[in-house]
């Protein structure tokens, strides 16, 4: 069976950490920001981890 190709869109959105966990950016931080609190925008800047149920599919998409 041939190797899986990396999903290039997923590769740009997710990063696999050294521990094996997958990080992602939060949504709702690209436009229409004037009505959002500074506190909310600050929290949206932080990275978060992919949920455990989604991790296997993401890991498969970004497989090297």
Swiss-Prot record:
Bias (Basic residues): 10-44
Keywords in alphabetical order: Ribonucleoprotein, Ribosomal protein
Ribonucleoprotein is among the record's keywords: yes
GO BP annotation list: translation
The UniProt record lists the keyword Ribonucleoprotein: yes
InterPro entries per the UniProt record, alphabetical: Ribosomal_bL35 (IPR001706), Ribosomal_bL35-like (IPR021137), Ribosomal_bL35_CS (IPR018265), Ribosomal_bL35_sf (IPR037229)
Single GO cellular component term: cytosolic large ribosomal subunit
Region: Disordered, residue numbers: 1-44
GO MF annotation, one: structural constituent of ribosome
Family in the record: Belongs to the bacterial ribosomal protein bL35 family.
Protein name: Large ribosomal subunit protein bL35
Gene name linked to the record: rpmI
């Amino acid at each position: 069976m041939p190797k899986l190709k990396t999903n290039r869109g997923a590769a740009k959105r997710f990063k696999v950490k050294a521990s094996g966990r997958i990080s992602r950016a939060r949504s709702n931080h690209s436009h229409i920001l004037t009505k959002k609190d500074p506190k909310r925008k600050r929290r949206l800047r932080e990275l978060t981890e992919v949920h455990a149920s989604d991790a296997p599919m993401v890991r498969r998409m970004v497989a090297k």
